[in-house]
C-alpha cells in the first residue's frame, strides 16, 4: 500500500495518478488512523503536506510507528 501525505484528497489523487497508481494501490492520509490501518506501508510526502488539518495527530502516529519499527519507506517529494 502507498500512503500519500498531502493537504487534501485532490492533491493526493493527482500525485497517485502521476506515479501510475490505481485506486486500491494508494490511500490519502487524512488522519492518524490510516497509518495504524496500514503498517509498514510506503509513505509519500508531497507538497503542502504541512497544511493537512490533522497534521499533529499524523506526525505523532508517524513518530510512534517509527519507534515501533512499523514504518515503511518515507519519501519526501515536497522539496525540489
Label the model's feature ranges.
Residues 1-80:
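Short, flexible loop motifs at catalytic/binding sites
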Amino acid at each position: 500500500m502507498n500512503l500519500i501525505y498531502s493537504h487534501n484528497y485532490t492533491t493526493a489523487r493527482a500525485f497517485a495518478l502521476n506515479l501510475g497508481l490505481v485506486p486500491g494501490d494508494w490511500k490519502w492520509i487524512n488522519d492518524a488512523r490510516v497509518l495504524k490501518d496500514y503498517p509498514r506501508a510506503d509513505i509519500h510526502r508531497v507538497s503542502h503536506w504541512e497544511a493537512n488539518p490533522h497534521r499533529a495527530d499524523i506526525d505523532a502516529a508517524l513518530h510512534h510507528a517509527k519507534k515501533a519499527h512499523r514504518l515503511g519507506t518515507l519519501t519526501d517529494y515536497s522539496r525540489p
